């Protein structure tokens, strides 16, 4: 949610900032880095991956100037680990009462860069 303040400044939620940083990282790192998205939500959540996880995947695609729907890879549920691929793989974990955690990871095989966000309410 974006709010306009009396000082004409924009207050942006941190998940929107994560989306923006994901786009920048994807564009900056280029094709040598593979990416994946991991998310955790409460055990009652039915959909996977979450809308936010898909939004972050779109951020990766935008950064690469690629069609997101052609970049969607495998969608895992409750895996302890999951692979990188030429496409964007997603892993969704459902446990407890977790409000939401999202993590975008880029790997070149020699380096890993991770962006993450955790919500508490």
Question: Which residues are covered by each model-predicted region?
Answer:
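Donor/substrate-binding cores of folate-linked one-carbon enzymes
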Residues: 16-24
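Rossmann-fold dehydrogenase core element
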Residues: 2-13, 27-35
């Amino acid at each position: 949610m974006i709010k306009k303040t009396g000082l004409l400044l924009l207050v942006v939620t941190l998940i929107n900032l994560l989306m923006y940083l994901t786009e920048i990282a994807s564009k900056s790192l280029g094709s040598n880095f593979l990416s994946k998205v991991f998310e955790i939500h409460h055990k009652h959540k039915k959909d996977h991956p979450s809308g936010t996880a898909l939004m972050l995947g779109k951020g990766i695609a935008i950064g690469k100037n690629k069609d997101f729907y052609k970049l969607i890879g495998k969608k895992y549920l409750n895996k302890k680990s999951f692979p990188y691929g030429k496409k964007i793989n997603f892993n969704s974990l459902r446990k407890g009462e977790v409000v939401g955690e999202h993590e975008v990871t880029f790997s070149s095989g020699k380096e890993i860069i991770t962006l993450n966000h955790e919500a508490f309410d």
